[in-house]
A protein has these predicted regions:
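Bacterial Sec-dependent N-terminal signal peptides
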Residues: 1-25
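Acidic/polar, glycine-enriched structural segments that form the non-catalytic walls/loops
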Residues: 19-44, 48-342, 361-366, 372-381, ...
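Extended, well-ordered alpha-helical scaffold segments
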Residues: 300, 304-307, 364-375, 437-453, ...
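Active-site cradle of extracellular carbohydrate-active enzymes
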Residues: 369-372, 376-404
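Beta-strand segments within the central parallel beta-sheet cores of soluble alpha/beta enzyme folds
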Residues: 28, 32, 325, 367-370, ...
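The feature captures the catalytic groove of carbohydrate-active enzymes
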Residues: 327-342, 390-440, 454-518
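A conserved hydrophobic secondary-structure block that centers on an alpha-helix together
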Residues: 152-167, 178, 187, 415, ...
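Alpha-helical support elements that line or immediately flank enzyme active sites
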Residues: 311-314, 349-363, 419, 425-435
Length: 519
C-alpha cells in the first residue's frame, strides 16, 4: 500500500508539473487591457513588441491573425526630386518673398505624396485556421507583456514577443483538432489595392514594383522570402509542433540589414523552449516595471499612464532604431503605412522619448540617442547642401538611415529641428550625470547644433538674432502662409534653448571661452 501511495503522489506531482508548463504564469493588474472579443481591424489589435519586432493580435474576417512587423523593413530608394540646384533653403526663402510658392510645393511636397518610396514596408501575417467557436476573453497582461485569448470551448492562446530576442511565441491549449499556422504575404503584386479601413493609408504596396515573394512549406515549418528594392530582402519563418491539444510555436522576422536570420532564430528558440524564453522575457519586464511607478487618484488616468509605459517598453531599446510613426506595428491593410511610417522629428520622436527621463528608463532611451549620434555625417551633409552652413541640422521627416524625404518643408526641413533633438542629449546628461556622455556625446552634439544655428541666423540692427524665415509645425499646412517673417514662439524657444544649453555644457566642461560665446 505504501509503495502504491507514493507512486500515486509522484504521478500527481508530475502531472501538476506538466500542467504548469502548459500555461505561462501571469500577473494581472487593474490597468490591463481586457475585451470580450478580438479586434476586427489591425489598428485596434493587441500590440506586442520589443523595439525590433512586433505583432498585432486581431481577427480578420473570422480568422485569428498576427500582423508581423520589424523596424528595419524599409524601401530606401533615394528621393531624387530633392536633389538639384534648388535644393536650398535660400531658394525657398526667395520663392516666399516673391509670393511664388507652387514651385516649392512641386519640388518637395508633391513627390512625397506621389511616389511610393522611400517608405517603411510591412512584414507579413500569421493566420490560424481555427474552427472552435466564439472568443469570450482577450487580455493583455501589462506586467508580462503577454496576450491571452480564451474561447468558449475551452481553448486558450498565450502569445508574447520576447523582450530581447527577435522572436514571438504562441501556445494554444485544449485544441480539438490539428492546426497549422499559415504565413500570409503582403500583396506586392496588386498596384490597385484599396484600403478597406478608415486609416490614413498610403498607396498600394503593389506600386513599389516588387516581384511577389515566395512561400515554402515543410512539416512544422513555413518560410516566406521577399525581395525589395536595391538588393534588400527579408524573411519570415514560423516553426511549430502539436502534441495532442497543445500547439506551441515560434516566429521570427529578419531583414538583410541585420545579422539575424529567421530560420536560425526560430530553430534556436525551439531548442531553448517556450518556458526558458518566457523566463528570460520576464527578466526584462520585471526590471522594466521596477524602474519607476506612478500612483494616480484617477483610475482612467492611471490606466492610460500604465498602458503608455507598456507601449514605451515595447517600442524602445538601447540597441534599437528609434520609435517611428507606427513603431513596430506597421499597417496591415495591403497599403503603405500612414505617412510612410517614417521618422517625424517635428514632435513625434521627441514626445515619444520624454518618458525615458522622469520614468527612469535612460537605457531604453539610448536607442534614440545612439541613432542620432551615428547618423551625424548624414545630417551634416544635408545641412551643407540645403542650408549652406557648417554645423548640423536634422531633417524633420527622414528615412531609417536619416535621409530627408521632403514633404511640407515648413516642418519636414524646418530650420530648428536639431535644437529639439539636442534637448534629448541635454536631458540624458541632466538625469544621468554621466560626465563621459557629457564630454563625448551631449556637448559635441549641441555644439554642432549651435554652430549651425549661429550661421543660419543673422543679428538685426536692434541686436536681435533672427532666422530668414520661421515656422511652427503644421500651422497653415503646406501653404505659403505657414512661413513667417517674425520668429514664431516655436523657433524662438528652440533657439534660446540650444544656445543656453551649449553654453551650460561648455561651462560644465571648463570651456570658458566657448561657454561665453554661446551665451
Amino acid at each position: 500500500m505504501k509503495k502504491e501511495f507514493w507512486l500515486t503522489c509522484i504521478s500527481v506531482c508530475l502531472l501538476a508539473a506538466c500542467c504548469e508548463k502548459e500555461s505561462l504564469p501571469v500577473t494581472p493588474t487593474s490597468s490591463d487591457l481586457q475585451f470580450g472579443h478580438l479586434a476586427k481591424t489591425w489598428d485596434e489589435g493587441i500590440p506586442l513588441g520589443n523595439a525590433t519586432v512586433g505583432t498585432l493580435v486581431w481577427q480578420r474576417d473570422s480568422v485569428l491573425r498576427f500582423s508581423l512587423d520589424r523596424t528595419d523593413l524599409w524601401d530606401l530608394r533615394p528621393m531624387d526630386s530633392i536633389a538639384g540646384p534648388n535644393n536650398r533653403f535660400a531658394w525657398v526663402c526667395e520663392q516666399v518673398r516673391k509670393g511664388d510658392y507652387l514651385p516649392v510645393q512641386k519640388k518637395f511636397d508633391h513627390p512625397y505624396n506621389a511616389l511610393p518610396a522611400p517608405s517603411k514596408i510591412p512584414g507579413a501575417a500569421l493566420e490560424f485556421p481555427l474552427n472552435i467557436g466564439k472568443v469570450f476573453s482577450v487580455h493583455l497582461f501589462l506586467n508580462n507583456a503577454l496576450c491571452e485569448v480564451l474561447w468558449e470551448n475551452g481553448t486558450k492562446l498565450q502569445t508574447f514577443v520576447h523582450a530581447s530576442e527577435p522572436v514571438g511565441w504562441f501556445v494554444f491549449e485544449n485544441l480539438p483538432d490539428t492546426v497549422s499556422p499559415e504565413i500570409i504575404a503582403p500583396r506586392y503584386s496588386n498596384p490597385d489595392e484599396v484600403a478597406g479601413d478608415n486609416s490614413h493609408a498610403g498607396p498600394a504596396l503593389g506600386r513599389l514594383g516588387y516581384k511577389q515573394g515566395t512561400i515554402q512549406k515543410e512539416a512544422g515549418t513555413t518560410t516566406f522570402h521577399q525581395e525589395g528594392w536595391g538588393g534588400f530582402s527579408y524573411d519570415v519563418v514560423v516553426r511549430w509542433q502539436q502534441k495532442g491539444g497543445t500547439l506551441s510555436g515560434v516566429w521570427s522576422l529578419t531583414s538583410s540589414l541585420a545579422a539575424d536570420r529567421a530560420d536560425q532564430e526560430t530553430a534556436e528558440a525551439m531548442e531553448r523552449g517556450v518556458e526558458a524564453d518566457y523566463r528570460s522575457h520576464m527578466d526584462f519586464w520585471k526590471g522594466y516595471w521596477a524602474q519607476s511607478s506612478v500612483s494616480l487618484p484617477d483610475t482612467l488616468l492611471q490606466k492610460q499612464y500604465d498602458n503608455e509605459m507598456y507601449k514605451f517598453g515595447s517600442a524602445a531599446r538601447e540597441d534599437s532604431y528609434p520609435i517611428s510613426l507606427q513603431a513596430v506595428w506597421t499597417a496591415d491593410n495591403g497599403m503603405l503605412p500612414p505617412w510612410k511610417g517614417d521618422y517625424h522629428h517635428d514632435l513625434n520622436t521627441q514626445l515619444s522619448y520624454w518618458p525615458a527621463y522622469t520614468g527612469n528608463h535612460l537605457q531604453e532611451g539610448m536607442g534614440y540617442l545612439n541613432t542620432l549620434w551615428e547618423q551625424r555625417d548624414v545630417y551634416k551633409k544635408y545641412t551643407r547642401e540645403y542650408f549652406g552652413t557648417d554645423g548640423m541640422n536634422v531633417p524633420g521627416v527622414c528615412t531609417l538611415t536619416g535621409e530627408p524625404m521632403g514633404g511640407w518643408v515648413q516642418y519636414s526641413m524646418s530650420p530648428t529641428v536639431s535644437a529639439w533633438l539636442g534637448q534629448h542629449f541635454y536631458l540624458h546628461w541632466k538625469y544621468s550625470a554621466d560626465r563621459i556622455f557629457l564630454k563625448e556625446r551631449a556637448y559635441p552634439f549641441l555644439k554642432d547644433v549651435a554652430t549651425y544655428l549661429e550661421q543660419i541666423s543673422t543679428v538685426d540692427a536692434d541686436g536681435v538674432r533672427r532666422l530668414p524665415l520661421s515656422s511652427s509645425p503644421e500651422i497653415f499646412d503646406n501653404s505659403i502662409n505657414a512661413w513667417f517673417k517674425d520668429m514664431t514662439n516655436y523657433d524662438l524657444s528652440l533657439m534660446h534653448f540650444a544656445f543656453n544649453a551649449a553654453s551650460e555644457l561648455a561651462s560644465e566642461l571648463g570651456l570658458a571661452d566657448e561657454a561665453a560665446h554661446w551665451k
